[in-house]
From Swiss-Prot:
Glycosylation sites: N248, N261, N348, N388
GO molecular function, one term: serine-type endopeptidase activity
EC numbers: 3.4.21.-
InterPro entries on file: PCSK9_ProteinaseK-like, Peptidase_S8/S53_dom, Peptidase_S8/S53_dom_sf, Peptidase_S8_Asp-AS, Peptidase_S8_His-AS, Peptidase_S8_Ser-AS, Peptidase_S8_subtilisin-like, Peptidase_S8_subtilisin-rel
Enzyme class name: hydrolase
Record-stated family: Belongs to the peptidase S8 family.
Entry-linked Gene3D superfamilies: Peptidase S8 propeptide/proteinase inhibitor I9 (3.30.70.80), Peptidase S8/S53 domain (3.40.50.200)
The protein's role, per its UniProt record: Secreted subtilisin-like serine protease with keratinolytic activity that contributes to pathogenicity.
Full protein name: Subtilisin-like protease 2
Propeptide residues per the UniProt entry: 17-122
């Protein structure tokens, strides 16, 4: 049974330590949610077939509970819980006894049955300010000073205006001054918890995407889609939230003006990889973190989703931090060490962190920026443009990864540019 190794990708480090080490992998039997599963249905089923299937599941589950006293084990078996529909992908979560799981695995309408898993966020600590990441975005990959506050960040003044960045994370402090009223609360999947950010990570990520000081796309809107609370979640909540995002983008006619950022990475989990692929086919771009294990990202979710934009971390002098995952599945490298952004604890709070969690929103911000300046028509056009702008062969120790660093293309534009810092 495959277990999930999720850690929120902002790695802890002590003051003065410029080479953070990765958190231990969070794998073990406790990662599986006892008695809870994600069921993926085969494609091509009609609404009537899906409805009949659910009735069959309820009947079989009820009969098995009565016949085998499954509840005596202490495992919660409540039947079907939530249904997820992303493009033409249909899945549902549920609490089932072992006999029902066996019956489900043999059902002709069922593609797969996966145990639900806990998803964990790693610990974070505070570090002195560093502002090199934005300057790097417009430097064509030239090394920039780590601690300088005089680095220029040049950008088109459309700066993501009219674009929506959905942050699937721990929530966002939408009242933070960095967002200037451009952040809104979207969906909260966590039962009996307020739609706030008690952990800090979602606010941090959103600040890199669209903060007025720390953001790549300084005029973009950000939407809080909360699937984590104070350190952990399950795919039951993550899939619910991703499903809501895709529906909201579609219903709001924002497909060409929206990007999803998911700055979390863990062991391979096919149901979520499938969801990312279906969102892409529906016309929605997703940017994800490569992961912080210092290993090949091909075994990570959602980094291994073929049509996600997978982002590794690079340092200010163009070296790969030892924590950053790598490999052929990594599409692009972006600033990911000692990056300052918004934080929890107040409407002016900031923190400096490291990890591919910081790298991913730099690229999500670039996607929002390019959507506003170039009117890119599809996620495939978005990916092609982002990769076309990259600067090649700069990352030291990129392993067998495509060696491409992020660039916003501003030096090729023919007009007076605003400068930042």
């Amino acid at each position: 049974m495959q277990l999930l190794n999720f850690g929120l990708l902002l790695l802890p480090f002590v003051a003065g330590d410029l080479a953070p080490q990765p958190e231990p992998l969070l794998a073990g039997p406790s990662d599986v949610v006892p008695g809870q599963y994600i069921v993926t249905l085969k494609e091509g089923l009609t609404s009537a077939q899906i409805r009949d299937h659910k009735k069959w599941v309820s009947s079989v589950h009820r009969a098995n509970l009565e016949g085998f006293a499954a509840g005596a084990s202490g495992v919660e078996t409540e039947g079907i819980m939530k249904h997820f529909h992303i493009h033409d992908l249909n899945m549902y979560s549920g609490g089932f006894d072992e006999k029902t799981v066996e019956d489900l695995s043999r059902n002709p309408y069922v593609k797969s049955v996966h145990p639900d898993q806990h998803v964990y966020l790693a610990k974070t600590v505070t570090q002195r300010q560093a502002r090199w990441g934005l300057g790097y975005m417009s430097s064509k990959g030239k090394p920039v000073p780590l601690h300088s506050t005089l680095v220029d960040y040049s950008y088109d003044d459309k700066a993501g205006e009219g674009v929506w960045a959905y942050v699937l994370d721990t929530g966002i402090n939408v009242n933070h001054v960095e967002f200037e009223g451009r952040a809104i609360l979207g969906h909260n999947a966590i039962p009996n918890k307020p739609h706030t950010d008690e952990f800090g990570h979602g606010t941090y990520v959103a600040g890199i995407i669209a903060g007025k000081t720390y953001g790549v796309a300084k005029k973009a809107n950000v939407v809080s889609a909360k699937a984590f609370d104070t350190g952990s979640s399950t795919y039951n909540y993550i899939l619910e939230t991703y499903d809501w995002i895709v529906r909201n983008i579609t219903d709001s006619n924002r497909k060409n003006k929206a990007v999803i950022n998911f700055s979390i990475s863990g062991a391979k989990y096919q149901p979520f990889d499938d969801a990312v692929e279906k969102a892409f086919k529906a016309g929605i771009a997703t940017v994800v973190a490569a992961g912080n294990d210092g290993k090949d990202a091909k075994n990570n979710t959602p980094a291994s989703s073929p049509n996600a934009i997978t982002v590794g971390a690079v340092r200010w002098e163009n070296t790969r931090p030892s924590f950053s995952n790598y490999g052929k599945i990594v599409d692009i490298w972006a600033p990911g060490e000692l990056i300052k952004s918004c934080w929890k604890g107040g409407n002016n709070a900031t923190s400096t962190q490291s990890g591919t969690s910081a790298a991913s929103p730099h690229v999500a911000g670039l996607v929002a920026y390019l959507m506003s300046t170039e009117n890119l028509p599809s996620p495939s056009a978005v990916t092609a443009r982002v990769l076309n702008l990259t600067i090649p062969n700069l990352v030291k120790d990129a392993k067998d990864s495509p060696n491409r660093v992020v660039y916003n293309g501003i030096q090729e534009r023919k007009f007076t540019l605003p400068k930042y810092f």
